A protein has these predicted regions:
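N-terminal accessory regions of nucleic-acid-interacting proteins
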Residues: 1-37, 41
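Short acidic catalytic loops
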Residues: 37-42, 114, 167
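Acidic beta-strand-to-loop metal/phosphate-binding motif
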Residues: 38, 88-94
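A short alpha/beta connector and helix-capping loop motif
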Residues: 47-62
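Metal-dependent phosphoesterase core characteristic of DEDDh/y 3'-5' exonuclease domains
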Residues: 57-61, 96-153
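Short active-site oxyanion
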Residues: 64, 84-89
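Acidic, Mg2+-coordinating catalytic module of metal-dependent nucleases/exonucleases
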Residues: 142-200
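Acidic catalytic cores of enzymes that act on phosphate-bearing nucleotides/polynucleotides
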Residues: 182-282
Length: 282
């Protein structure tokens, strides 16, 4: 049975913490009947190749659900929600969230709206923070002190709960206001197309955008890049943990000059890794 978190529902949408499969099933049934959802994610991406999805926040017009990704084994069931064309999913800075969702749950989010992209379109300005958009539309100041919080740590603190809930609490209200303005300007579809481009950019393997930037580079440079990416994926570590970009150029120079392989060993400080690299570039 869903239980409200104490002290988190007075004059606000009640918050429900979802950390068991049975509660998760209840939530899935409830949100599958909604037409609009606010969505945000909290994750850790400091020491891994793939993001560690820690929390998914989902809001309806009346409730907020904090889904503990570290406690559930069936998160993939959310894909039916994320891929449902009949449910609008509202984000702020959609690309970062869909990148995490795509690489964590292998889902491509459909029928989404990004209040940040919409606001940039409406104000003809720069991308604005969530706090600034909330202040503009709702005249509320929100606390962003947990921006760099450790979301892998359990139990989640009271401050983290407030922060996470606020990140989705206002999304639907702002979306409805922006939608009215955009429709009056006959610009709603134009903004939706901009948002779809962001979703497409986020819904791909992590190496693809970086590799596209190398389209005019030599084949050996691309081969070295992909070698590092593949090893990083296998070990689930950031590519820079294998060797930094500055050593990328050093290795290419050494290889082009046909220098002794010992120099590659010196750079990588790992004989097995060096042998693997040399073989892959032959």
């Amino acid at each position: 049975m869903l239980t409200k978190l104490k002290n988190y529902f007075l004059k606000k949408n009640p918050i429900f913490y979802v950390d068991s499969e049975s509660i998760f099933e209840e939530v899935l049934k409830e949100i599958s009947g909604e037409k609009i959802l606010g969505v945000d994610t909290e994750f850790d991406w400091r020491n891994t190749y793939y993001p560690n999805l820690c929390l998914i926040q989902i809001s309806t017009k009346k409730k907020i659900f904090l889904i503990d990704c570290l406690r559930l084994d069936s998160l993939f069931k959310l894909n039916l929600i994320f891929e449902n064309e009949d449910i609008v999913k509202v984000f702020h800075s959609v690309r970062s969230d869909v990148t995490v969702l795509f690489n964590s749950l292998n889902t491509k989010v459909s029928n989404s709206f990004d209040i940040q992209i919409a606001e940039k379109f409406l104000s003809s300005g720069d991308l604005k923070s969530y706090a600034k958009i909330v202040l503009k539309y709702l005249n509320l100041n929100i606390d962003k002190s947990e921006t760099n919080s450790n979301w892998l740590k359990r139990p989640i603190t009271e401050s983290q709960i407030n922060y996470a809930a606020n990140d989705v609490r206002f999304l639907i209200k702002i979306y409805l206001q922006q939608k009215k303005i955009l429709e009056r300007k006959n610009s709603f579809l134009a903004v939706k197309n901009l948002i779809k481009k962001e979703i497409d950019l986020g819904s791909q393997e992590l190496f693809i955008p970086r590799l596209k930037k190398m389209k005019h580079r030599k084949k050996i440079e691309k081969d070295l890049f992909m070698w590092r990416e593949n090893i990083a994926k296998e070990r689930n570590v950031p590519p820079s943990y294998l060797f930094k970009d500055k050593n990328f150029k050093k290795i290419l120079k050494i290889y082009d000059e046909n220098t002794l392989r010992e120099k590659i060993y010196d750079i990588l400080q790992n004989e097995k890794l060096a042998n693997n690299l040399i073989e892959s570039l032959k």
